[in-house]
């Protein structure tokens, strides 16, 4: 039998939407753990698997109840009822996503594969609303946003009681700037309760009774919080300087863009005026050419008409001659003499050739 440690990570996200106040708040609780997988000889042993599944389900259920209780007592102290009731908010959605990674321990061995979990990630997403939902969904984009984050390290097991220690606690305000609080602020935000990292708390509804007089403030957590805050301060200063430099460069780019836009606008106006003038000249020229063409067309039509009249007169004259006996005798006599002389010349030329 082989003992393998696996990384376990559970994320609980509670989203509270208030339509009347036009805001929503997200509370995110991250739970980290490093557990050894349950030991049994073969994965095909159904009884061992069933026993482990039942134990795992009890552990997960107890952890979820504790997280609900933590959120309710921290942000809804005056709320009564079950752990799933947060004041007058109504639950509208629950989404659970699990990701489990297993490896085959007998990869290089013959026989049936032996799988062991090496990674387990789970995300629980709860949405609560109150008030009247707007008809236009785009109005929700104008809501104010805020976010609270709690990171918790889980130790022990269900038999020994669920032991946990808070690693850090911070909020993301509406401006979007991360602010890591000091340990005293962390303690105050957790319902004013100080919890000892070594305190043993069972997974029942009265789990807070064991945490009321405990102490959250360990030396390691305090130093970690202050060091984290100092690092964030340096990072924010550097980020602010870089942001100022970027803003200065962006302003220069904006000025350059404005100048370019002004130049482009002037060029566009000049080109438009030039195009208008050109179109006016072209239009005038076109009208003049059109007038000249019309005059030429009229003259051509007049000439055609005159030619047509002359042709008609010629036809009428020919018809008249045809009706009166053809051409005059003088015309025939001239043509007869012409062709007679030509015939005589050709005949004499032919005789001389022989």
UniProtKB/Swiss-Prot annotation:
Residues 326-353 form a coiled coil. The keyword Coiled coil applies. Keywords: Coiled coil, Virion. One of its GO terms (cellular component) is virion component. Its main location: virion. It is found in: Virion. It comes from the Viruses. Residues 309-326 have a biased composition (Polar residues). Residues 309-333 are annotated as: Disordered. This is Uncharacterized protein R692.
């Amino acid at each position: 039998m082989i003992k393998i440690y696996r990384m376990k990570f559970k994320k609980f996200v509670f989203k509270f939407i208030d339509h009347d106040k036009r805001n929503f708040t997200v509370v995110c609780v991250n739970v980290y753990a490093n557990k050894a997988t349950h030991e049994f000889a073969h994965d095909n042993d159904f009884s061992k698997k069933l026993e482990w599944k039942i134990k795992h389900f009890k552990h997960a259920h107890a952890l979820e109840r504790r997280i609900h209780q933590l959120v309710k007592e921290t942000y809804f102290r005056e709320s009564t009822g079950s752990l799933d009731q947060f004041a007058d908010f109504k639950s509208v959605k629950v989404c659970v996503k699990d990701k489990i990674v297993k490896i085959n321990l007998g990869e290089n061995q013959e026989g049936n594969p032996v799988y062991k979990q090496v990674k387990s990630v789970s995300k629980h997403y709860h949405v609560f609303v109150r008030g009247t939902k707007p008809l236009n969904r785009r109005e929700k984009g104008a809501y104010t946003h805020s976010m609270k984050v709690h990171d918790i390290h889980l130790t022990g097991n269900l038999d020994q009681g669920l032991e946990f220690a808070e690693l850090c606690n911070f909020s993301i305000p509406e401006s979007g700037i991360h602010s890591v609080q000091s340990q005293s602020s962390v303690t105050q935000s957790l319902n004013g309760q100080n919890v000892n990292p070594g305190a043993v708390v069972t997974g029942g509804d009265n789990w807070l009774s064991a945490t009321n007089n405990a102490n959250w403030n360990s030396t390691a957590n305090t130093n970690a919080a202050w060091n984290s805050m100092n690092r964030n301060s340096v990072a924010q200063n550097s980020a602010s300087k870089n942001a100022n430099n970027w803003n200065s460069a962006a302003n220069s780019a904006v000025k350059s863009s404005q100048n370019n836009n002004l130049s482009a606008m002037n060029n566009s106006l000049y080109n438009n005026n030039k195009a208008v003038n050109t179109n006016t000249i072209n239009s005038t020229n076109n009208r003049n050419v059109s007038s000249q063409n019309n005059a030429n067309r009229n003259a051509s039509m007049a000439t055609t008409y005159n030619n047509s009249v002359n042709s008609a007169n010629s036809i009428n004259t020919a018809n008249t001659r045809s009706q009166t006996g053809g051409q005059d005798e003088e015309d025939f006599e001239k043509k007869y003499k012409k062709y007679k002389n030509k015939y005589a010349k050709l005949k004499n030329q032919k005789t001389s050739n022989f």
